[in-house]
C-alpha cells in the first residue's frame, strides 16, 4: 500500500509499504529517499511517537495514512526506566524533555497514569516541571520508577457556595499540602482557608491519616472571617500554646483546640482571662478577648465539678468545687465571688442547712447541684 510522510518543511514523501513493515523498515525507506539517517528520524502518527520494533498494523496505519516526520534534536537519546518488578523500559527522549513528558511516554508504553508515577534518579525524586538536563540525565542513564503508595486517593472539598473541588492526595499529605493544592486550583491563600472534617478544624501540621480522612471523604472549606486571629494560652507549667481562633469561637471550641494540641480533655480544662473563669457557651468576643490576648489554663482535679448557688434575690452563682470541699471552703469561695463573709452565710440543700465541717460528698452534692444561700440576720444566734 502507499502511505505518506509529511516533514516539518511541508514536503510530502510517498512510500510503498506493507502493513507488516516495522517502523525501522519505514525509516530505512525514508533514508533511501531522503538520505536522513534512521536515528535522526522520529515518526508521529495520531499524536503518538512510533517505536522502531512495532509494525504499521500495530498502530492501525492503513493505506494513504499520513505520518509526520520530525528530526531529532542533537539531544535526542535513549534512557532506561527500571520498575520495582525489575522490568526495564527504553525511552526515546530529548535532554530538553520535562519529567512530565517522560511520564507521558511511560504512560504510552505501560499505561500507568503520570499521577501514579514517581521517578527517581541518583537518589532524588524528579519534579514534573524540570527537564532531564536539569538533573544531568544523559544518554543511557537509568531512572527508577516507583508507583505511588495506595494512599493516593481522591478527596472532595466543599465550599460554602456549594461548589465541590476534587483533589488528588496521599494519606500522608499534611493539611498544609492540601491547602496548597486548593490554592493551586482556586487561588485562595492557605492562611485564609479553614478546613473542617467531622466537625473538627484541621491543623496545618497534621496529616490526612491523623484525622482518618480516607478516599472520597468530603472536607468543608470555610474562609477565615476577618476576626481570624491568634491567641495564647499559658499553662501552670509556664508553657505557652498558640491557637488560631475566630472572635465568634465559643469557649467550648477553644477547649477542643487545646485538646487537639495538648491532649487535655475539655472537662479537665478551666480557662481564666482577666481574673474570670470563662464559661463554655460564651464566645471570645463576649469576654472582649482580642488578637494576641493571653488566657490562663488551669487543670481541674479529678473530683472537680461545678455547682450553683442561688440567692434569695434570684441571682445564681457558679462555683468550681471538689466533692471533698468542706462547707467552710464553699463559703470562702462565695466570699471571693460576692464579698459576703462566711459567718453571714447559711447554705441549704435538699431542705437541710449545711454544717461547716462537713464535705459536699457527705451531703451527696454532685455536679450541677443547686444550693440555696440565705443571709443570716445580724441578731441571729444559730
UniProtKB/Swiss-Prot annotation:
Q: Where is this cross-link: Glycyl lysine isopeptide (Lys-Gly) (interchain with G-Cter in ubiquitin)?
A: 6, 11, 27, 29, 33, 48, 63
Gene Ontology cellular-component terms listed: cytoplasm; nucleus
Subcellular compartments:
Cytoplasm; Nucleus
Propeptide, residue positions: 381-382
GO molecular function list: enzyme inhibitor activity; protein tag activity; ubiquitin protein ligase binding
**BP GO annotations:** meiotic cell cycle; modification-dependent protein catabolic process; nuclear mRNA surveillance of meiosis-specific transcripts; proteasome-mediated ubiquitin-dependent protein catabolic process; protein ubiquitination
Would the keyword DNA-binding turn up in this protein's UniProt record? no
Keywords carried by this UniProt record: Cytoplasm, Isopeptide bond, Nucleus, Repeat, Ubl conjugation
Pfam families hit by this protein: ubiquitin (PF00240)
Residue location of crosslink Glycyl lysine isopeptide (Gly-Lys) (interchain with K-? in acceptor proteins): 76
Annotated Ubiquitin-like domain residues: 1-76, 77-152, 153-228, 229-304, 305-380
Further remarks about this protein from its record: For the sake of clarity sequence features are annotated only for the first chain, and are not repeated for each of the following chains. Ubiquitin is encoded by 5 different genes. Ubi1 and ubi2 are synthesized as a polyprotein with one copy of ubiquitin fused to ribosomal proteins eL40A and eL40B, respectively. Ubi3 and ubi5 are polyproteins with one copy of ubiquitin fused to ribosomal proteins eS31A and eS31B, respectively. Ubi4 is a polyprotein containing 5 exact head to tail repeats of ubiquitin.
Function description: Ubiquitin exists either covalently attached to another protein, or free (unanchored). When covalently bound, it is conjugated to target proteins via an isopeptide bond either as a monomer (monoubiquitin), a polymer linked via different Lys residues of the ubiquitin (polyubiquitin chains) or a linear polymer linked via the initiator Met of the ubiquitin (linear polyubiquitin chains).
In terms of PANTHER family, this protein maps to: UBIQUITIN
The family note in this entry says:
Belongs to the ubiquitin family.
Q: What is this protein called?
A: Polyubiquitin
Give the organism the record lists.
Schizosaccharomyces pombe (strain 972 / ATCC 24843) (Fission yeast)
Amino acid at each position: 500500500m502507499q502511505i505518506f510522510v509529511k516533514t516539518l518543511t511541508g514536503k510530502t514523501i510517498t512510500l510503498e509499504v506493507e502493513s507488516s513493515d516495522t517502523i525501522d523498515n519505514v525509516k530505512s525507506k525514508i533514508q533511501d529517499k531522503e538520505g536522513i539517517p534512521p536515528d535522526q528520524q522520529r515518526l508521529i502518527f495520531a499524536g503518538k511517537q512510533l517505536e522502531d520494533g512495532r509494525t504499521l498494523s500495530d498502530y492501525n496505519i492503513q493505506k494513504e495514512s499520513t505520518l509526520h516526520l520530525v528530526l531529532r534534536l542533537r539531544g535526542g537519546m535513549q534512557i532506561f526506566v527500571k520498575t520495582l518488578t525489575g522490568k526495564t523500559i527504553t525511552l526515546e527522549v530529548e535532554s530538553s524533555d520535562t519529567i512530565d513528558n517522560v511520564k507521558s511516554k511511560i504512560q504510552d508504553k505501560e499505561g500507568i497514569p503520570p499521577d501514579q508515577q514517581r521517578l527517581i534518579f541518583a537518589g532524588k525524586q524528579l519534579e514534573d516541571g524540570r527537564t532531564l538536563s536539569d538533573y544531568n540525565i544523559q544518554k543511557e542513564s537509568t531512572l527508577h520508577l516507583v508507583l505511588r503508595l495506595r494512599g493516593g486517593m481522591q478527596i472532595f472539598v466543599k465550599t460554602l457556595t456549594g461548589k465541590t473541588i476534587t483533589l488528588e492526595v496521599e494519606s500522608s499529605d499534611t493539611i498544609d499540602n492540601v491547602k496548597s493544592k486548593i490554592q493551586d486550583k482556586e487561588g485562595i491563600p492557605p492562611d485564609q482557608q479553614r478546613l473542617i472534617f467531622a466537625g473538627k478544624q484541621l491543623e496545618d501540621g497534621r496529616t490526612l491519616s491523623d484525622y482518618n480522612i480516607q478516599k472520597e471523604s468530603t472536607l468543608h472549606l470555610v474562609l477565615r472571617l476577618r476576626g481570624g486571629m491568634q491567641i495564647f494560652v499559658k499553662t501552670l507549667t509556664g508553657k505557652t500554646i498558640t491557637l488560631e481562633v475566630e472572635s465568634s469561637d465559643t469557649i467550648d471550641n477553644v477547649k477542643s483546640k487545646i485538646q487537639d494540641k495538648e491532649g487535655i480533655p475539655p472537662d479537665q480544662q478551666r480557662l481564666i482571662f482577666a481574673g474570670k473563669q470563662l464559661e463554655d457557651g460564651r464566645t471570645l468576643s463576649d469576654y472582649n478577648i482580642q488578637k494576641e490576648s493571653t488566657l490562663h489554663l488551669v487543670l481541674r482535679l479529678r473530683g472537680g465539678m461545678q455547682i450553683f448557688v442561688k440567692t434569695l434575690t434570684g441571682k445564681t452563682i457558679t462555683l468550681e468545687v471538689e466533692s471533698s470541699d468542706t462547707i467552710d471552703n464553699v463559703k470562702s469561695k462565695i466570699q471571693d465571688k460576692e464579698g459576703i463573709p462566711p459567718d453571714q452565710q447559711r447554705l441549704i440543700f435538699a431542705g437541710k442547712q449545711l454544717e461547716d465541717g462537713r464535705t459536699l460528698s457527705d451531703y451527696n452534692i454532685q455536679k450541677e447541684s443547686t444550693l440555696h444561700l440565705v443571709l443570716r440576720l445580724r441578731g441571729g444566734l444559730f
